[in-house]
A protein has these predicted regions:
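Short, low-complexity Pro/Thr/Gly
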Residues: 1-358
Length: 358
């Protein structure tokens, strides 16, 4: 847990957060079965289970490794994506290379709504207005045995030794306001509530049995104004062998067809699953992901966060469903569905509350 506005903070507005840490050198280590090891692909992301933002003791948003990975694949242009790959130790394939990802300092740029200045420069977190609330990051991490892998992805081996990260820190990008502007905004927030448009992420996860064929997944737990849906499949075996952000099956798409329905009416035609990997991103000004990341947008330009340009109010839809069929012989795994929604952070007298609670 890290407090962002404790005594000694340096600025008024937060625009970026980056987690930085060093990992010990494992290039000379062997597993209990005698295999050489390296850290998992995208170790800078994979090491984490969740990163949560709290204001005044209330969770405002939660980041998962999968969602950060999805945004880096779809919302970043090629140059930014390549730089991001270098920061987190990301490679296009999981093929084992004993000379990569065995040590070093890694950086994880978080992707909360105010951290996406490489996509949209309009958002920020006005820390100076939240003087009566604690702003806090809470991180949950995996064990090292979960993020160290070997050449043949054997799942019965273990390291047989204890590893530890070192020199962790949070890099915070602050903006300093002119004293007159700061005073004016503080006085205004004491007189009337200030409203700030934000994004949040919602998640649905369902178990996928082996040879599951097809099934419908209810989306009724999703709420409010949603701009975009993403969904991915992860096999349990790949997760167990340290391939946490691998969404394929036999190097191809594990999904066969997809259809979205609202109240028994077709919201989309039944499409080949690759339509949502290749065509939907093209139509909605997103990058084509290098992985089997499926997306459907209700927005004309989902990267334009500061100006809503198309949403779907899931609170008003009684029976939203997604109908998915899988290719033959897909193993046991999970299907994760993510939704990006709008919300409003209300600030008055130094305290912040959400307009809608998830």
């Amino acid at each position: 847990s890290v407090k962002l506005n404790e005594e000694g903070s340096y600025g008024d507005i937060i625009t970026n957060l980056v987690i930085s840490f060093e990992l010990p050198d494992i290039s000379s280590l062997l597993t209990t079965g005698g295999r050489k090891v390296r850290y998992s692909n995208s170790i800078g992301i994979s090491l984490f289970e969740t990163v949560e933002l709290y204001i005044g003791g209330n969770m405002i948003d939660r980041q998962t490794p999968e969602m950060i990975d999805i945004l880096s694949e779809t919302h970043f242009n090629t140059h930014i994506r390549n730089n991001f790959d270098n920061l987190v130790g990301k490679f296009e394939t999981d093929d084992f290379d004993e000379n990569t990802n065995t040590s070093g300092r890694f950086y994880l740029p978080l992707q909360f709504w105010f951290c996406r200045t490489n996509v949209d420069k309009q958002f920020n977190l006005p820390m100076f207005l939240l003087y009566n609330d604690l702003i806090e990051l809470r991180c949950k991490m995996k064990t090292f045995n979960q993020v160290v892998t070997n050449a043949d992805f054997n799942t019965t081996d273990s390291l047989g030794t204890t590893l530890q990260i070192s020199n962790p820190n949070i890099i915070v990008e602050y903006i300093l306001l002119d004293e007159k502007e700061r005073k004016r905004m503080l006085e205004l927030s004491m007189k009337e509530t200030q409203f700030f448009l934000i994004n949040q992420v919602q998640k649905i996860q369902v178990s996928v049995p082996a040879n599951s064929g097809s099934f419908k997944i209810e989306l009724k737990q999703l709420k409010y104004l949603i701009t975009q849906l993403f969904w991915i499949y992860k096999s349990d075996n790949k997760v167990a062998s340290g391939r946490h952000l691998n969404y394929n099956y036999n190097d191809s798409n594990p999904l066969n067809t997809v259809q979205i329905t609202f109240e028994k009416q077709d919201a989309t035609d039944k499409q080949d699953a690759n339509y949502f990997v290749l065509v939907e991103p093209y139509l909605n000004k997103l990058n084509n992901p290098r992985k089997y990341i499926h997306t459907f947008s209700f927005s004309i330009d989902p990267k334009m966060l500061e100006q809503p340009n198309g949403v779907c109010n899931f609170s008003e839809i009684h029976n939203p469903e997604i109908d998915i069929s899988f290719v033959d012989n897909v193993p046991v795994g999970t299907l994760q569905i993510y939704a990006i929604n709008y919300n409003v952070l209300q600030i008055r007298n130094g305290k912040g509350v959400l307009f809608h609670n998830l």
